[in-house]
Amino acid sequence: MLNYLAYSWLERNYKVETAIEMLMTAYNKKTNDPYITDSLGWAYYKNGDFIEAEKYLNYAIQLKPNDPVITDHYADTLWKLDRKIQARYYWQSIIESKSNELDKKVIKNKIIMGPNII
C-alpha cells in the first residue's frame, strides 16, 4: 500500500521527500519486491540522484527482467548516466516485447532522442 501511494505522489511531484521515506520503509520490509524496488529507484531518479537510482533499478530489473515499466525506468536512468548504448538496448527490448503497457511510439522516440523529449 505504501508503494502505490508513494509512487502516485512521485508522479505528481507531491511530497517527494516523504514519498522516498515511505518507499524506503516499504523496501526495508520487502527487499525482494521488484515494484517497491523500482519505485524507490524511480524516486531517486525524480530527485536527480541517478547513481542511487541506478542501484535500485538495476536490482529491480534483475528481480523482474521483462517488466516494461521497470525496463523503461532503468533505461531512462542509464541515459542520464551517459550510458546511451545500454539505454537504447533496454528501450529496444520494450519495442520487441509483446507488452502493450507502454506507448511504443514514445519508446521509439526515446531511442532516437532520449527521455528528455517527452
Question: What annotation goes with each model-predicted range?
Answer:
Residues Y4, S39, H73, I107-K110:
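Canonical tetratricopeptide repeat
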Residues Y7-S8, W42, D76:
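Residue-level recognition of tetratricopeptide repeat
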Residues L10-E11, Y45, W79:
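Position-specific recognition of the canonical hydrophobic site in helix A of tetratricopeptide repeat
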Residues P34-Y35, P68-V69, E101-L102:
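Helix-start (N-cap) detector for alpha-helical repeat units in TPR-like alpha-solenoids
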Residues K80-I118:
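Terminal, low-structured helical/coil segments at or just beyond the last alpha-helical repeat
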